[in-house]
Amino acid sequence: DLVLELPVPWSCARAQDFARAGVSLLHAMGCVELLSFGSECGSTALLCETAQALESPEMRDCLRGCLDEGMSLPAAREKAAAQCLGKEAAALLQGANDALAFEYLRALKSLHSPIRPLAVLRKGARHDETGCAEGFPSAAQIRSLILQDNPQGEKSLPSFSFEILRREITAGRAPVSYSAMETAILSHLRRLSPADLALLPDISEGLEYRLYEGIRSACSLGSLFSCVKTKRYTHARIRRLTLHAFLGVTQGDTALSPP
């Protein structure tokens, strides 16, 4: 077995860059035949068919119109898909795993990669769901249980995995959370200018100024995320921008492929 680690600029990037970087690593190896990924629908054929339709000129025009209405990209894609392709295609975009699957398929196509996609049906909790009592818990639910020191967190992991986590907790290196770094992050962000923020990946339309004002007034990361978020700029996007700013990741980093 071989485990490849996706470097930080791409591991905390938007779905498009995350998928492109991961697929490019596998493609560069020259020996990978199959790319499997979690999926809410579990149908490789349906995902491939819909992915091709999402790239149509009609869909692009419809998407542009939705974005011009001030919608976020995820919401705009879902609305455009419903208008151009029907409710079934729009429903696929509601699933976090299926939405990411489309980016994997797009990356495979752009690289002319011979790697074949394989969708694996996701069972149990949905992505980021924390209240699921049956089936496999989500990663978000497991993290929440561990942060609460809930014994159910240990039961949610294989014993060998939890032993590694227990060792890191004992050493003071885990669990990692925004709250543990909040003061350091806010302190660093307050030293940045709008020009610095303009260099961040996935920033546009003067968002750096809104982020800058939020940084100056917010007293916590939670309040920063809330005051910068709008209908167009999602909570997830603001969190990514904040993390990139703290780590010094710029557009120039994510525009490249992983080494």
Could you describe each region identified by the protein language model?
Residues E5-P259:
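Active-site cores that bind ATP or allylic diphosphates and position pyrophosphate for catalysis
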